[in-house]
């Protein structure tokens, strides 16, 4: 990266990566970007960057990317129209602001990706996600750190975003993108990705988010399925495994960090001890990353060895998954629980539950609302008022915990169609086999969109912007041949 900056100028390397990195960090540190001021400031920033790049570079925008932008712009317009029949006009106005921010973000990321390619965009998102996750992990290991919120609730990691499942989603995105960047990367790139795996992996684990883990698996499966030179790519990406797994294993020796409602004194003491061990493991993983190919004894003529390593690794992961799950029968028995149960406060047991945590009632109400207004919906942002109308509800809910079901209920089939067009069209641009960066961007965005089907992570703008940047990189991958432009390559 440094050599590219010196040879080709900082603009071609830093600027395209800084845009998504700054957007993710700024929105996530503003409580996830969940207020009108954050949306308005972000919209102004995205529009400004878009205008400057269009004026200076005049990029060629791929047709699928244009359709993606048009889909989100149509959603913003349709949301504004729903103000006419909305039962909660003030909430609808807020949603219009959100859609304008989303549209401006997609347009900005598409324009930047069309000029500099997808690699800087992916790198910027990875940097932003790693920064946020590193801070989040420090708030757990150093609960007395100035600015740390301390231990709250059931001790699931959620700061600075404010929602644990959204933080898990951001960590998932960062892990998949880091894996893509590590493939065929220079030694210093592999080192950076291997080190980033530690805060990303710890953040994902400490959120105890089942949806984020499912999204990670789905995203990795998609990325591996479409990437070129699959065996070599898997081996290169495996440099992240030690950095992501070893610290999680270390934490098992410190129950105050993985249990609900721990004593503050225990958490302070155990967090400091865990931090020392984690830093030591990062040093070892960094050393190994610089010598990764040598450690794996790879060579150009070792095709059979590579195949057996990949198969053996996959089998080992399968066995570990079965052992960790504690048996399929036990897990299936949890489907009827109203919320996840875990004995002794051990949050690890939460990962073995299939409870919907109360989402069933929310989804049923959203479905009934859709059936009442199938074409145009009840008005954007009205679900919260609909849920609150029944005082017998056992808990409050501001969203329908499903991007697609909520869109159908509030904006009808018209809004749902626009949303699906905006989200699906970018994936049609992927040329299989795809480059590692495009495959990673596709996997990260697909994992996020899967999790958004049963959670309200879409409403956490900082994480949504990270996913939209990945989506824009995929949508722009066919423009001007910029499928995987590396730092220092001539811009389109």
Residue ranges, per PLM feature:
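Aromatic-rich transmembrane-lumenal/periplasmic boundary elements in polytopic membrane proteins
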Residues: 135-146, 322-372, 376
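C-terminal ends of transmembrane helices
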Residues: 54-59
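Short, intrinsically disordered terminal tails adjacent to the first/last structured region
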Residues: 1-9, 479-492
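Alpha-helical membrane and juxtamembrane elements of multi-pass inner-membrane transport
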Residues: 155-158, 189, 360, 364, ...
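Alpha-helical transmembrane segments of multi-pass inner-membrane proteins
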Residues: 2-32, 40-53, 72-83, 94-111, ...
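TM-adjacent membrane-interface loops and short helices in multi-pass inner/ER membrane proteins
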Residues: 163, 348-397, 404, 411-418
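A generic secondary-structure micro-motif detector
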Residues: 64, 191, 356, 394, ...
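Interfacial helix-loop-helix linkers and transmembrane-helix boundary segments
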Residues: 60-65, 92-93, 114-121
């Amino acid at each position: 990266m440094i050599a590219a900056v010196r040879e080709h100028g900082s603009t071609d390397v830093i600027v395209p990566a800084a845009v998504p990195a700054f957007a993710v960090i700024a929105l996530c540190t503003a409580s996830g970007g969940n207020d009108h001021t954050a949306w308005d400031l972000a919209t102004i920033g995205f529009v400004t960057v878009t205008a400057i790049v269009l004026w200076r570079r005049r990029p060629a925008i791929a047709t699928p990317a244009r359709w993606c932008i048009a889909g989100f712009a149509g959603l913003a317009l349709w949301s504004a129209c729903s103000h006419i029949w909305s039962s909660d006009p003030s909430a609808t106005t807020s949603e219009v602001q959100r859609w304008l921010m989303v549209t401006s973000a997609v347009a900005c990321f598409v324009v930047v990706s069309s000029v500099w390619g997808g690699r800087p965009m992916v790198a910027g998102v990875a940097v932003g996600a790693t920064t946020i996750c590193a801070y989040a992990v420090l708030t757990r290991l150093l609960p007395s750190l100035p600015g740390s919120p301390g231990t709250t609730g059931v001790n699931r990691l959620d700061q600075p975003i404010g929602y644990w499942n959204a933080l898990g989603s951001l960590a998932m995105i960062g892990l998949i993108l880091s894996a893509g960047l590590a493939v065929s990367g220079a030694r210093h790139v592999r080192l950076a990705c291997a080190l980033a795996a530690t805060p990303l992996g710890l953040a994902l684990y400490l959120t105890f988010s089942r949806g984020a883990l499912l999204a990670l698996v789905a995203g990795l499966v998609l990325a591996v399925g479409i990437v070129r030179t699959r065996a070599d790519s898997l081996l290169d990406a495996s440099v992240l495994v030690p950095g992501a797994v070893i610290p999680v294993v270390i934490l098992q020796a410190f129950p105050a960090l993985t249990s609900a409602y721990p004593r503050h004194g225990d958490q302070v003491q155990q967090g400091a001890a865990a931090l020392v061990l984690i830093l030591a493991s990062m040093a070892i993983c960094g050393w190994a990353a610089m010598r990764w190919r040598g450690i794996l004894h790879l060579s150009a003529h070792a095709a059979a060895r590579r195949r057996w390593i990949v198969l053996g690794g996959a089998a080992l992961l399968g066995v570990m998954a079965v052992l960790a799950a504690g048996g399929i029968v036990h897990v299936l028995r949890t489907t009827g629980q109203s919320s996840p149960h875990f004995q002794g406060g051990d949050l690890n047991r939460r990962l073995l539950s299939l409870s919907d945590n109360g989402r069933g009632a929310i989804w049923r109400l959203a479905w009934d609302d859709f059936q009442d207004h199938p074409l145009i919906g009840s008005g954007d942002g009205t679900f919260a008022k609909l849920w609150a109308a029944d005082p017998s509800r056992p808990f409050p809910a501001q969203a329908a915990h499903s991007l697609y079901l909520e869109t159908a209920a509030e904006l009808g089939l018209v809004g749902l169609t626009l949303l699906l067009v905006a989200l699906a069209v970018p994936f049609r641009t992927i040329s299989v086999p795809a480059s590692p960066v495009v495959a990673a961007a596709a996997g990260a965005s697909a994992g996020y969109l899967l999790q958004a089907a049963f959670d309200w992570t879409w409403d956490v703008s900082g994480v949504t912007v990270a996913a939209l940047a990945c989506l824009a990189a995929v949508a722009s991958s066919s423009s001007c041949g910029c499928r995987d432009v590396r730092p220092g390559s001539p811009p389109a």
